[in-house]
């Protein structure tokens, strides 16, 4: 018996192939496999179980703002490295790498848009940029958001998804809590409405400052909302926390948020609130 002279072509076993990468997505809630384009059409909400995956800033713009258009404010502001912080990689290099990848310039975008035909001052955290952490630039942009909204007599809609204060800026990041809340208090004296939208996750210094100070605090389903994470709390107090602790539903039951609104209903819900809260007022141009 002789071996055949022709052999089949071989492949390098070290080459890893990803079938359907970027084409199919598995739901984190029910493990159903989705066409990625289908999830994009539903703004990252699973059609089988209703699980809400993270939606980026561009997706939120398209979902909430008329025609998805935002006249951005203060885009020139970018983070500095005042402490020359390094944890194996310098803070400056981390920011530069994110900019090189085409990510946002910072962990928040602000500007003027229209929601349901009504002018609003709009802000949305960018979780993909260092976990939506709040440093000096984020605090400054939130402050400017409220200050400009006060001058132009605009309602503020602010979407929050953040891990808290940015450790690379130390005490400078913590000072943004007081600074932003001071601007918010001046805004409130003008008797203008602030709608706070709490996304997954909203934690740390953001949760401890302006996140719960809205005239209406609206949360997405099953969002993690709180100061420290559940594991940190359990390790500190050495007790087991109640089921669902720090989730939207738990907070609603205990009066910490005013409503839980599924993502597909968010624009209509906010539009109705604005209609009631801004009746008889017109924004300045």
From Swiss-Prot:
Entry keyword Cell membrane: no
Name used for this protein in its record: Acetyl-coenzyme A carboxylase carboxyl transferase subunit beta
Stretches annotated zinc finger (C4-type): 27-49
Domain of life: Bacteria
Recorded catalytic activity of this chain's protein: N(6)-carboxybiotinyl-L-lysyl-[protein] + acetyl-CoA = N(6)-biotinyl-L-lysyl-[protein] + malonyl-CoA
UniProt KW keywords: ATP-binding, Cytoplasm, Fatty acid biosynthesis, Fatty acid metabolism, Lipid biosynthesis, Lipid metabolism, Metal-binding, Nucleotide-binding, Transferase, Zinc, Zinc-finger
GO biological process, one term: malonyl-CoA biosynthetic process
Cofactors (names): Zn(2+)
Organism, as annotated: Sorangium cellulosum (strain So ce56) (Polyangium cellulosum (strain So ce56))
Pathway: Lipid metabolism; malonyl-CoA biosynthesis; malonyl-CoA from acetyl-CoA: step 1/1
Keyword Nucleotide-binding (UniProt): yes
Residues in CoA carboxyltransferase N-terminal domain copies: 23-285
Complexes and interactors: Acetyl-CoA carboxylase is a heterohexamer composed of biotin carboxyl carrier protein (AccB), biotin carboxylase (AccC) and two subunits each of ACCase subunit alpha (AccA) and ACCase subunit beta (AccD).
Chain sites annotated for binding Zn(2+): 27, 30, 46, 49
PROSITE patterns per the UniProt record, alphabetical: COA_CT_NTER (PS50980)
Molecular function in Gene Ontology: acetyl-CoA carboxylase activity; ATP binding; carboxyl- or carbamoyltransferase activity; zinc ion binding
Location(s), subcellular: Cytoplasm
EC number: 2.1.3.15
GO cellular component: acetyl-CoA carboxylase complex
Function: Component of the acetyl coenzyme A carboxylase (ACC) complex. Biotin carboxylase (BC) catalyzes the carboxylation of biotin on its carrier protein (BCCP) and then the CO(2) group is transferred by the transcarboxylase to acetyl-CoA to form malonyl-CoA.
Gene: accD
Coiled coil segments of this chain: none
Entry-linked InterPro entries: AcCoA_carboxyl_beta, Acetyl_CoA_COase_Trfase_b_su, ClpP/crotonase-like_dom_sf, COA_CT_N
The record's free-text note on cofactor binding: Binds 1 zinc ion per subunit.
């Amino acid at each position: 018996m002789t071996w055949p002279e022709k052999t089949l072509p071989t492949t390098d076993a070290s080459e890893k192939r990803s079938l359907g990468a970027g084409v199919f997505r598995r739901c984190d809630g029910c493990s159903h496999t989705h066409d990625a384009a289908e999830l994009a059409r539903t703004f990252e909400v699973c059609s089988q179980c209703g699980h809400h995956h993270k939606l980026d800033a561009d997706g939120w713009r398209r979902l909430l703002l008329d025609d998805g258009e935002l006249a951005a404010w203060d885009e020139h502001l970018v983070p500095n490295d005042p402490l020359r912080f390094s944890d194996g990689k310098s803070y400056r290099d981390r920011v530069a790498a994110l900019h090189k990848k085409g990510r946002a310039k910072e962990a928040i975008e602000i500007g003027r848009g229209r929601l349901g035909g009504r002018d609003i001052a709009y802000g949305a955290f960018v979780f993909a940029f260092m976990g939506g952490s709040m440093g000096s630039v984020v605090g400054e942009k939130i402050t400017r958001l409220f200050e400009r909204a006060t001058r132009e007599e605009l309602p503020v809609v602010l979407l929050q998804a953040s891990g808290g204060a940015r450790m690379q800026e130390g005490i400078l990041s913590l000072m943004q809590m007081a600074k932003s809340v001071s601007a918010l208090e001046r805004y409130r004296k003008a008797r203008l409405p602030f709608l706070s939208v709490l996304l997954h996750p909203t934690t740390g210094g953001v949760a401890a400052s302006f996140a719960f100070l809205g005239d209406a605090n609206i949360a997405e389903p099953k969002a993690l909302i709180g100061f420290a994470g559940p594991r940190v709390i359990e390790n500190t107090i050495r007790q087991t926390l109640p089921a669902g602790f720090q989730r939207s539903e738990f907070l609603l039951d205990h009066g910490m948020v005013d409503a839980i609104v599924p993502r597909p209903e968010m624009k209509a819900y906010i539009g109705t609130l604005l209609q009631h809260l801004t009746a008889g007022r017109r924004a300045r141009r």
